[in-house]
Amino acid sequence: MKFIITLFAAIVMAAAVSGFIVGDKKEDEWRMAFDRLMMEELETKIDQVEKGLLHLSEQYKELEKTKSKELKEQILRELTIGENFMKGALKFFEMEAKRTDLNMFERYNYEFALESIKLLIKKLDELAKKVKAVNPDEYY
């Protein structure tokens, strides 16, 4: 009887130690799935911001012609929203890129995302400066 209890205890200990040494693969799978979904969502949001930037560029051309104060304020609001969203994403992805458990492909994805976000912030900021430089006509 002592032998069976000792054997059972040894099996339980071996299972616990092997689980500790090998690690929990399910956690890695969940983390990889989360990373993949996060990158897909980021790609969608970047695409939306790029389309918004294109639309705002067209509105800027109209602003140059009409010099409308309301249009200027609307463009600046939308640029501020897009820029703040991208700055928040930049902080998050800078933090995530420092993780040590990333493989080569994941690290590349994070670095590519960081550079894409930085470029979008730069473009949004440039357009905001152009819009701010337009003096609205108060007579319309």
From Swiss-Prot:
It is found in: Cytoplasm; Endoplasmic reticulum; Vesicle; Secreted. The Pichia pastoris-produced protein seems to be well suited for in vitro immune cell activation assays and for in vivo applications such as immunotherapy and skin-prick testing, because it is properly folded, free of endotoxins and has the appropriate allergenic characteristics. Non-allergenic peptides identified from the mapped major conformational IgE epitope-containing areas could be used for the engineering of house dust mite allergy vaccine. One of its GO terms (cellular component) is cytoplasm. Keywords: Allergen, Cytoplasm, Endoplasmic reticulum, Secreted, Signal. Thermostable. Upon heating, unfolds only partially even at 95 degrees Celsius. Upon cooling to room temperature, almost completely restores its structure, indicating high heat stability and refolding capacity. Residues 1-19 form the signal peptide. Residues 20-53, 108-140 are annotated as: Immunodominant conformational IgE-binding epitope. Expressed in the epithelium, lumen and microvilli of the midgut, and in feces. InterPro entries: Mite_allergen_group-5/21 (IPR020306), Mite_allergen_group-5/21_sf (IPR038455). One of its GO terms (molecular function) is protein homodimerization activity. It comes from the Eukaryota. Monomer. Homodimer. Belongs to the mite group 5 allergen family. This is Mite allergen Der p 21.0101. It comes from Dermatophagoides pteronyssinus.
